[in-house]
């Protein structure tokens, strides 16, 4: 069980049903429940973290705002962004929250290296950065020794909604995406047109770092009501 991971591709979904489904999964899981990673693209939404301050939303306009229970401040999710929710029993894996954050950041850093993109984490602000521009946001919640929420990696999306907020609470934080970094040198091997182009690499890096060897892949199109 400690080596087994279920990876679910949920396709494109609204935020709130998936958020509620994460709660249900975490509330109902027990020691025999497999760890899971959910891959999803969200319809446009701003999500406020537990510590989210209203002043960091500058002009939401027609994009809805959802008050979430993850760590961190406000961020934006939209089509073309790879969201991975990491539902792991940390006690069973014998890792702490800080170690999990480091593993997730290194998963993204290693994934980006496949595209010859150099990136790094920052001790003062969780996430992954390319030349101090943010390419991946990170926010987690722990309940009953289990993690939920996860990462949001910008692949090929409309970045303009980030200008309506102070991303993750940082005024003037510049956001960047993978497609813009590789579009002039794209090949069949390092294509970054769609989130699905990056899914296999991300999962490979995550399962290597977190030592999963028995991986089951599922595709779901349900709306998690």
From Swiss-Prot:
GO molecular function annotation: lipoyl(octanoyl) transferase activity
Presence of the UniProt keyword Cell division in the record: no
Assigned GO CC terms: cytoplasm
Keyword Mitochondrion: no
Site feature Lowers pKa of active site Cys, where: 134
Function: Catalyzes the transfer of endogenously produced octanoic acid from octanoyl-acyl-carrier-protein onto the lipoyl domains of lipoate-dependent enzymes. Lipoyl-ACP can also act as a substrate although octanoyl-ACP is likely to be the physiological substrate.
This protein's name: Octanoyltransferase
Name of the gene this protein is made from: lipB
């Amino acid at each position: 069980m400690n080596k087994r991971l279920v990876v679910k591709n949920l396709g494109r979904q609204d935020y709130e049903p998936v958020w509620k489904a994460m709660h249900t999964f975490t509330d109902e899981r027990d020691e025999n429940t497999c760890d899971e990673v959910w891959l999803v693209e969200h319809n446009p939404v701003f999500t406020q973290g537990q510590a989210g301050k209203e002043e960091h939303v500058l002009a939401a306009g027609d994009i809805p705002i959802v008050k979430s229970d993850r760590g961190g401040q406000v961020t934006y999710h939209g089509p073309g962004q790879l969201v991975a929710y990491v539902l792991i029993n940390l006690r069973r894996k014998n890792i702490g929250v800080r170690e999990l954050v480091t593993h997730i950041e290194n998963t993204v850093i290693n994934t980006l290296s496949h595209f010859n993109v150099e990136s790094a984490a920052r001790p003062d602000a969780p996430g992954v950065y390319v030349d101090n521009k943010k390419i991946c946001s990170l926010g987690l919640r722990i309940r009953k020794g289990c993690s939920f929420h996860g990462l949001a990696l910008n692949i090929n999306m409309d970045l303009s909604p980030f200008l309506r907020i102070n991303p993750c609470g940082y005024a003037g934080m510049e956001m960047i995406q993978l497609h813009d970094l590789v579009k002039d040198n794209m090949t069949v091997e390092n294509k970054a047109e769609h989130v699905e182009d990056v899914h296999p690499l991300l999962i490979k890096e995550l399962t290597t770092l977190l030592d999963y060897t028995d991986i089951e892949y599922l595709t779901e199109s349900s709306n998690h009501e």
